[in-house]
Amino acid sequence: MSSLVTGVDLPPPSLYRKSAARGGELARAERGKNADSLRSVRQERGEGPTVLFDIETLRSAADVGGWDKAHRMGIALAVVCHLEEGRFETFLEPRAAELAATLKAAGLVVGFNSRRFDYTVLSGYTGEDYARTLPTLDLLDTMVERLGRRVSLDHLTKETLGAGKTADGLQSLQWVKEGRFDLIEEYCRRDVELLRDLYLFGRREGYVVIAERSGRIKVPVDW
């Protein structure tokens, strides 16, 4: 744990939390900070665009016989953030090949548990080993390297940004059964927005925040 710095002076996790009085001010300030971070990304990554993505599945691990069979789960939909363009794109299952092509065209693909999960789901359509071939920054891998254990995206964004997920994978699977792909898209896009903001915060500040029994702690990152 020597790489961790006790956050005695950390601000409360309300960076993105909108109060009635200061919501607009905080939002404008954060947009300005993100714009600065994006300029830095553009300057440093000349070899191709940066994309962030997340996949929601049609079937659960129980449906397909275990997490080791994620390639059978199928794509309900995926959301991609084209970072430098500030644009989001949604891919339904029939566009799985286009999703793969979009990721292949990127200079950097950012995800959360993407190496083990999202890439495996996508490989069910193409047979390709994306964890080996794509330039990837998996933020979960970074946390495991720093902490020696896994930590959820929801925990990281709540502690670092003051904003969390709006649903979870089980709820998404229920929406699949109900045919509510509009709600799945809203949920998945929110996850990608959180991923983007966490990534940009880490680039700009050089750390993210977790909560331990001893208090809130800064975890250095160098992405």
Task: List each language-model region with its residue ranges.
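DEDD superfamily 3′-5′ metal-dependent exonuclease/proofreading module
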Residues: 1-223
